Amino acid sequence: QAGDKVFFAFSFGPFLGFWTAFEAATELGCMALPGGGLSGAGRLGVMMENRVDALCCTPTYAAHLGEVARAEGVDVSAIGLRRIIVSGEAGGSIPATRERIETLWPGARVFDHHGMTEVGPVTHQCPAQAGVLHVLEEAYLPEIIDPKTAEPVAAGETGELVLTTLGRHGSPLIRYRTGDLVTAAESPCPCGRLDLALQGGI
């Protein structure tokens, strides 16, 4: 939210997710702090000095940075971190991975986010349920199909996520087969959102 300090543990490289998340944070009115080429200890120092509210990184790096803090004797609770937004690889919706990260960062909650280079940001974690991702239906028309027959699957069944982009002019995609296997939630989401909810992440 506006006024939050968000630390991005990425360098300004070709990873598209970093750029879109960094830009989104600044558009929201957050102070966006890039990690650049700092070491783990250096990044922890910046986080401590600025009392950051949120950390953006991959799930494995969130765990790694937490282990570095333990090894260095850094009291991460003094940072005041409240949210860890993970992307770039599977993990944030896997209960054991999420629990490990939240154990290493007491007081912080993990939020999973998923996207892809071909289409951009695709899902965000439900605020009411860990491990449930909502598709950004204002940007995509999602379908879930049987990867072998290309027929639609019922809610609760696992299938391949197919996306049609809405409003993209430079590189629109129609019924793009992502290769990602997902399971649509069988009941309405308690958060009240009507966007497609994916149970268990990607």
Residue spans for each PLM region:
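Short, composition-biased local secondary-structure segments
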Residues: 1, 14, 67-71
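Conserved AMP-binding loop of ANL adenylate-forming enzymes
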Residues: 2-32
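Active-site glycine/GP-rich loop and adjacent strand/helix microenvironment
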Residues: 28-202
